[in-house]
Amino acid sequence: MTYQTTIKDLLPYLYNIETNLAGIFDDCGYQFAPVLIAGQVGDPGIYNLPSTTPVTTESVTYLAAGVPVSDTYTGTTLWDLLNDAGGVTTTTAKNDILSKYVIATGSDGYQAVFSLGEIDPSFGNQPVLVAYSDTAGQLGPNGSDGLARMVVPGDIAGGRYVSDLVSLKVESLPEPGPGGAGGISPQATLSGAVADPTIVTPETLIALNQSTTETATYLAGGTPVTDTYTGVSLWTLIQDAGLLTDPAIKNDLLGFAVVATGSDGYRAIISLGEIAPNFGDQPDLVAYSDTGGQLGPGGADGALRLIVPGDAAGGRYVSNLVSLQVIDATAAAHLSS
């Protein structure tokens, strides 16, 4: 009989070694909280979090098993940490950063995905933190949450607060992206990890009887734009199609994302954790009309457009939408490795 050992199998053993070392260093007055940063960064390697800059503090309240937890964490934002690691490597494609994501992995193999668009200061600007200490004493050699953990201010439940953090891997959608002739698109497909793939049109969205309205201000080419959009929430649309996750995997949906593609092949990825009501609860919208007249007959943005309220710039506002593909981003990463 042959046995195959994977890195995932070794994680608990490697992490025990790191924790023991951290205890020894702590006794000597040196704080040790190593995290592997891998994938598409300029300088991959193991980084000791207390040595990274700038140092940031976040006070948060979130639900853990339904119970409110409040704590104050110290660490470096995920965006700054990736820059410490040489920055995310990108191509010359327009807003290529929006096709990339980070997989955070704990010592037990638990994972959560973060889109780069969520944390990039030019877009979502969410202060997701990679923390190495806290006022409650849950982090450190003797803490129950390990040497490091993800902290996601604003999330309702703590599913994306990956504890016993061992690695952060930057991945990208397969290159090159799907080509497209551009132009006005009358509809989009919803496909991938859903039970009921479908064609999405303004008529099918209206028929759901779950339309909502969002007023958003964002930068387009450096110019502020304000518009009011009507559509159906992206989360509602995916749920209506039947998201296919594995109930045996804890918070499996946090490893999933949706890829929005325009008629010209332009793409942006959004993690499901960002929009799930129990977690990020961001009101991203698949819009079919707007007060500015850019959607619908005669509009330059086509029949459908992805709207991401709160983003500083409109890079994730994919217009002339032709595809919404739900993917297991962690599985896609294994295929590309």
Whereabouts are the PLM-identified features?
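N-terminal intrinsically disordered, low-complexity segments enriched in P/E/S/T
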Residues: 1-337
